[in-house]
Amino acid sequence: FLLVSMMIIVSIATRSGMFNWIANELLRFTKGHPKLVLLTLGVFTAVTSAFLDNVTTVILIMPVTFFIAKQLDINPLPFLITEIFSSNIGGTATLIGDPPNIIIGSAAKLSFMDFLTELTGVVAVILVVIIALMLFIFRKSLKAAPEKMAAVANLDNSKTITDFPLMIRSGIVLMLVILGFILHDITHVETCVTAMLGASFLLLFEKPKDILCDVEWNTIFFFIGLFIIIGGLEATGGIALMAKWILAVTKGSQEATAMIILWASGFISGIIDNIPYTATMTPMLLEIQKTMGADYTLPLWWCLSLGACLGGNMTIIGAAANVIVSETSAHNGHPIPFMKFLKYGVLTMIISLVISSA
């Protein structure tokens, strides 16, 4: 319900042009300097991904990226690769930023503020380091003629907002929903209820049929089917056996167990989608929690979140946002070679996990 409600809120807010307007204003601020553009796109993508799903974020930012690259007459790949990394990094910071976190938060009863308190600091450090790394790696590509930069600096943003009342309405609802998430520990209102109230209010002013068509029902039913399969594994005792095996290998050491979960999650999530992986690991951690207690397991949840979300940066197929950017880029005449992305992705993931391990 949380995922469906947030998809509805984001779909309605997007129709107003709000996110494109924000992105364009930030880009005007850069005055067209390619390095500042990369920095701005990276930070904007990360912050937006903390509150919207990664796929929605990259879909919003890509048209702006291609427009800017065309105006500056430079290759858009440095921007696009940075946006992929930033979307996965930023999505790690909050409960609603990435589907694995929604799964973890629901299973472990972790609140929006729990994620914000525990993960935002390390995510911010990782983001700074990775954007600095991208600026260094692509330094030779990030050059543009002065007259090209002037075109971006004078970007007309006056017609980006297509529905001003809708922007105000959806913006207020989005802020109130996020505030509700933050105040969860005080109000004790479930995050899914808060999101559903916000989505229901916005639907009063829209045609529900049109909005519901924008919901990614394939993803929702994928989740439903996945949880049924995981429930079967749990009922047959398969999950309990996995939990006992991990504790036997680490001899019950919390630090060793945490490091195994962090690094294994990173590499596995780079090869397969992080959603089914997280859905499989979650009941296993709950089994460990039954044996070792909640205090022992709490750091393991954060390791699972960091590993699963950040591991998506390893390959071009590691996360749904990566695939969307890759396909769109190819359609626009700028394919992202698998091996080229892997070269940057492995480095990005290893640096991210090293920082997470510290």
Predicted regions mapped to residue ranges:
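Hydrophobic alpha-helical transmembrane segments
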Residues: 35-43, 57, 80-81, 116, ...
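Re-entrant/interfacial helical elements at transmembrane boundaries that shape
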Residues: 23, 56-67, 80, 94-108, ...
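Hydrophobic transmembrane alpha-helices of multi-pass small-molecule transporters
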Residues: 1-15, 120-244, 336, 343-358
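Membrane-embedded alpha-helical segments and adjacent helix-loop junctions characteristic
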Residues: 1-74, 217-219, 224-292
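Transmembrane alpha-helix interface/packing and boundary motifs in multi-pass membrane proteins
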Residues: 44-53, 84-96, 180-186, 263-277, ...
